Structure formats: C-alpha cells, structure tokens
Amino acid sequence: MFILTMGLNHHTAPIDIREKLVFKETEEEMALVTLQQEKSILENVIISTCNRTEIVAVVDQIHTGRYYLKRFMANWFQMDMEKIEPYLFFHEESEAVNHLYKVTAGLDSLVLGETQILGQVKHAFEIAKQTATTGTLLNKLFREVVTFAKKVHHHTKINENAVSVSYAAVEVAKKLYGSLDNKKIVLIGAGEMSELALQNLAGSGMTDITIINRTKTNAELLANQFQAKVGAYENMNEHLLLADIVLVSTSAAEPIIKQAAMQELMEQKASSMLVIDIGLPRNVEHDCSYIPNFHLYDIDDLAGVVTANSIERQQIVLELEDTIESEVRNFFEWEKQLGVVPVIRALREKALDMQEVTMTSLENKLPGLTEREYIQIGKHMKSIINQMLKQPISELKEMSVEEDATTSIEHFKRIFGLTKTDVTIIEKEQAETRS
C-alpha cells in the first residue's frame, strides 16, 4: 500500500482552471464513493476549497494509482485528461504526508498561517469517514495532521496578525477609496467567507452594509450579528446601483453577475464601483472587468495584498520543517509496525490458548479448587504471560522498522512456533473488520 496525493492549487493553476475543478458540497459523498470504486484505490479523502482541490489516497501501486486518480478527475469534471494534466501535481509517500501536514497547518495556504483550512481538512476527513472511504492508514494520518495543526496554531505565532482573503479585500477598498467612511457596501452571499469579510468590514468602521442572499433567512441571521441590513435577492441590481463596494461570495455554479446587466447598470450609475469576487467558481463574469468604472478583483488578484506582510510567518514555516519531517518519520515507522500487528496478535492468541489448556487441566486435576481460587490462578497466569511477552513484542516492533525487517520477523515467528496459518487467520480477520 502506498500514500499518493494528486491535486491542483493556487501554486499550480490559475483561477479559471481551479473554478472548473471544484467538488460541489452536495456531491462530496458521491465523488468519494465513485473514486473508491476505481481500480487501485484503497482509501481516499477529497479536499476541495477555493484555493485547492486535492485527493489523498491509499493505492495498491503508485503507477496505476496515478492513472486512475487522473482518470477519475477527468471523468468527474467531463474534461480531457490532457487538458487538466499540466495543472496537476503528485506527491508520493513521505512527500504526500509532508504536504498534508503543511496544508492542514496553513503552511501551504495563500494566507500563510490561516486557520480556515484546518476546519476544511477536518470536514473533508469526517465526510470520508462517514462515507467509509477511509481505513487504517488515512484514519491515523488525518488524526495526526489535525492534532499537529492545532499545536502549531497554539504554540507559534504563525496565525498572529495573519491576513486573510477577506482582509485583503478591505485593504483593496482602502487603496481605491482612501477612507471607507460613508461608503455603501453590498455583500452577496451569507456563508463562511461572507462572515469573515463582515468581521473585517466591521473592524474598518463601515456601517452601511446590506446583505443579499438567495435564502433570505440566512442573510437575516448574519445581518443580526453585525447590525447590517438585508436586501431582497430579486432586487439585487437596485442595491448595486447605490453601492460603492460589492463583495460576492456564493456557492453558485455559474456567475450571478453578468456583463450585459452590469454594462447597462454602470451607464446609469454616477460613481465607480469596486467589486471583489471571492467565490469559486467565480460569481462575476470576467468580461465585467472591461466595463468603465467597474473595478473587478478575484481571489488571485488579492494575492499580492495577502503576501505583503507574511515575512515573519515564512520564517516560522522554515523553523517548522524539521518538526514536520520528524512527524513524517514517526508516521512511517508506525506504518511499518502495522505489518507485525498480526504476528503480535497471533503470539498472544497462542499464549492464551496455552493458558486455557492449562486451566482446563488444573480444573480436572484439582477438582477441589474453589471458584475464587480458580479465578485467581487464571489472573496470575495471564499476568505472567503478559510479562513474558512484553520484551519480545517490544523487540519485534523495533525489528519492524529496521532494514532487514522481513528476515528478522521470520526468525521471530520460527522461534515462537508461529505458523503461516496462525498469522494469515489474523490478517483475514483484520481485513474483514476494515471492510
């Protein structure tokens, strides 16, 4: 079994490619199940955010795994494999694990040190667990990376004063308008990104905020938190006509702000309008950027603002490299020890079988034993067995991570009289439990 990661992110693909390869939240479970049915795929988790789409998989062979991951992506998004291949990256084994540690801790994010990705990775893992597409390896790996990410944010300054995409949006508005006092803002969408944007807007002193959302109750809930107004979705253009700044972040699959409508609207509008599209797929047609006085920014346009004050956090990332490498080594040592688990269980079961035979013999030869005496003898015998096996099992685990592990383990089995059948039975039981 091998760990293989395939994906694309803000490093490898522009937004016009990324937005075509986003898994819809309503289709997450179906995507996981479909991928699990591909040849070579043993376990899988899909992470899909505004800046990355990545698949972490356990495969039976690296070469075939790479092919079937690519084929799945091409089929799912109905695109030619050759068209998406230039934007994809692959990480294998230790590189894949190292990458996941960095992603989860926010060390590979557009916003260095941001914590939102931690929640997104946890969500992706939980969905995969519920859908039964994870097993022994990915369950262990994702628990470890989530724990590590929490420690990083708690014990370092990586997320201290970290800018966010929504923060960058406010900074762009300040550069264009100077003071944001008395500026009218319209926020389209009422999800997590919209809430983060509102937090930054409130911190900038803006008070004239209108929230528009297709589901009005969601807009009302958000508006109540920030003393904002709620606008009717069907009257969106009327609100845009009065707006100075528009932030758009919805889960719509197609643009909701169209070039033709905006061309007409801007001809009626007396002032310029800043439109910041932080949705993926994008919520505003790109051709709107050609309309006079219509200043359009998308996520990639905000990148320069986001990275402007990240020098200190980049230093923290470098300092964490050795720690991550240590975590990666620990994971693969644990994985190697997985191979001896059936041997350990077979040894314990053999010892317990011997105890059971001995206790039956004692019962026959010493019929005068009381029930209490019989139980006490059994407990002491089990204690002796555990003490006798403790050191050999510890040595076996050490052997499992050495270069000549296979030979050493075979010697161990022969010394303790463990047959191939003894171990195979345990392995089959484990496989049935995992499935």
From Swiss-Prot:
Swiss-Prot/TrEMBL GO biological process terms: protoporphyrinogen IX biosynthetic process
Enzyme Commission number(s) of this protein: 1.2.1.70
Keyword NADP listed: yes
Entry binding sites for substrate: 49-52, 109, 114-116, 120
Keyword NADP: yes
UniProt keyword terms in alphabetical order: NADP, Oxidoreductase, Porphyrin biosynthesis
Highest taxon listed in the record's lineage: Bacteria
Xref: Gene3D superfamilies: Glutamyl-tRNA reductase, N-terminal domain, NAD(P)-binding Rossmann-like Domain
Reaction it catalyzes: (S)-4-amino-5-oxopentanoate + tRNA(Glu) + NADP(+) = L-glutamyl-tRNA(Glu) + NADPH + H(+)
Pathway: Porphyrin-containing compound metabolism; protoporphyrin-IX biosynthesis; 5-aminolevulinate from L-glutamyl-tRNA(Glu): step 1/2
Function: Catalyzes the NADPH-dependent reduction of glutamyl-tRNA(Glu) to glutamate 1-semialdehyde (GSA).
Subunit structure: Homodimer.
NCBIfam families named among the record's database cross-references: hemA (TIGR01035)
Domains (record comment): Possesses an unusual extended V-shaped dimeric structure with each monomer consisting of three distinct domains arranged along a curved 'spinal' alpha-helix. The N-terminal catalytic domain specifically recognizes the glutamate moiety of the substrate. The second domain is the NADPH-binding domain, and the third C-terminal domain is responsible for dimerization.
UniProt family annotation: Belongs to the glutamyl-tRNA reductase family.
Further comment found in the protein's record: During catalysis, the active site Cys acts as a nucleophile attacking the alpha-carbonyl group of tRNA-bound glutamate with the formation of a thioester intermediate between enzyme and glutamate, and the concomitant release of tRNA(Glu). The thioester intermediate is finally reduced by direct hydride transfer from NADPH, to form the product GSA.
Protein name: Glutamyl-tRNA reductase
Organism: Listeria monocytogenes serotype 4a (strain HCC23)
